[in-house]
Amino acid sequence: MYEPTLTVESFDSELAGAIRDERRRQEHHVELIASENYVSPRVLELQGSVLTNKYAEGYPGRRYYGGCEFVDIAEQLAIDRAKELFGADYANVQPHSGSQANAEAYMALMNPGDTLLAMDLSHGGHLTHGSPVSFSGKFYKAVHYGLNAHGDIDYEQAAQLAQEHKPKVILAGFSAFSGIVDWQRFREIADSVNAYFMTDIAHVAGLVAAGVYPSPVQIADVTTTTTHKTLRGPRAGLILAKANPELEKRLNSAVFPGSQGGPLMHIIAAKAVAFKEAMQPEFKTYAQQILKNAKAMAEVMKERGYTIVSGGTQNHLFLVSLLDKNISGKEAEAALGRANITVNKNTVPGETRSPFVTSGLRIGTPAITTRGFKEKEASQLAHWVCDILDDIHNEKVIADVKQKAHELCGKFPVYQELD
């Protein structure tokens, strides 16, 4: 039926060229975006498997289509491994993304118009934590806590807002906070107002799975996450919970048929193998190195005179405030990009610019750690970042750093073995 020679390269040269160029970019650029990583060849293989052909609405053993006996095995493996990896009593592996996992959890826990208490976006939260431009801020009444003067979560403010607004859900989680969340303290705040306690560990899921960051799974009512980022799986979502049969039914219904139809079985299989990878001893070593590399980079940038929000990092990322440098995040991102160093601009506490410009950078170490970078390379890289930010319009400095970055990437290839 299909000719084995019918490759993308021979059939669609334009698309093949774009993919080839992206492959080269990933090999020759230093990736410092905290939410990005490099998946294993196993994860890549499964995302391109024949499981993409199978419709499987429903759950293992309870499908609306025939012929699901083998995809049932794949999904059940993913469920069982997720529960084991995170110490959960319940796992739903069907969410297509972290944002959808959040939407589905909200659907199970709230009605439209109910109040959600979560972290402010400019202080490190996420769009789906009640931003007015997101469904989470359109369908629910969002109230936000932030960071205190020391750069830590302002638990007193959160407790005060909880008493004032009596939210239905209190959410703890972040996309740009470099500290450790006191999950138990949030649990106590939620209990004080009879609210559900939900956590979003999208950024630290791999660290939680490896045991190098505290787990909220048996503290919160519901935990959501992505399966990429530090977990190093496919781009997708996951919902976890401690035992609560009634809530489990509501979560399942919120995913299907509440907001999704047929699950992506090829992605679910990729999740299953990623969870197995995260159970291996070397994954814990990897997670520990992520933390070491982030600390090394943050320390260098502090020594070079840059303001690190929260004073440093205790996880995989840190936020650099450029408010006192007369540099926008947009300018910094572009200059570093010309040097083959990929970062993302980010809003910071006290932000004065628009979200499209910003006054900060978010820097993360999951991807460089996957490549094999250790503290030596991380520190060296931080110095190069500072060299560019110190003289942001100096194209010679940018060119010099680009050459160094290219050489460093050559020593730590990502997928060269696949060529």
From Swiss-Prot:
Listed EC numbers: 2.1.2.1
Alphabetically ordered keywords of this record: Amino-acid biosynthesis, Cytoplasm, One-carbon metabolism, Pyridoxal phosphate, Transferase
Pfam families with a match to the protein in the record: SHMT (PF00464)
GO cellular component terms given for this protein: cytoplasm; cytosol
Protein's UniProt name: Serine hydroxymethyltransferase
Residues at the site labelled Plays an important role in substrate specificity: H228
Catalyses which reaction(s): (6R)-5,10-methylene-5,6,7,8-tetrahydrofolate + glycine + H2O = (6S)-5,6,7,8-tetrahydrofolate + L-serine
Binding-site residues, (6S)-5,6,7,8-tetrahydrofolate: L121, G125, H126, L127, S354, P355, F356
GO biological process: glycine biosynthetic process from serine; tetrahydrofolate interconversion; tetrahydrofolate metabolic process
GO molecular function per UniProt: glycine hydroxymethyltransferase activity; pyridoxal phosphate binding
Family per similarity comment: Belongs to the SHMT family.
Subcellular location: Cytoplasm
Domain of life where this protein originates: Bacteria
Function comment: Catalyzes the reversible interconversion of serine and glycine with tetrahydrofolate (THF) serving as the one-carbon carrier. This reaction serves as the major source of one-carbon groups required for the biosynthesis of purines, thymidylate, methionine, and other important biomolecules. Also exhibits THF-independent aldolase activity toward beta-hydroxyamino acids, producing glycine and aldehydes, via a retro-aldol mechanism.
Entry keyword annotation includes Lipoprotein: no
Modified residues (N6-(pyridoxal phosphate)lysine): K229
Organism, scientific name: Coxiella burnetii (strain RSA 493 / Nine Mile phase I)
Cofactor needs: pyridoxal 5'-phosphate
PANTHER family according to UniProt: SERINE HYDROXYMETHYLTRANSFERASE (PTHR11680:SF50)
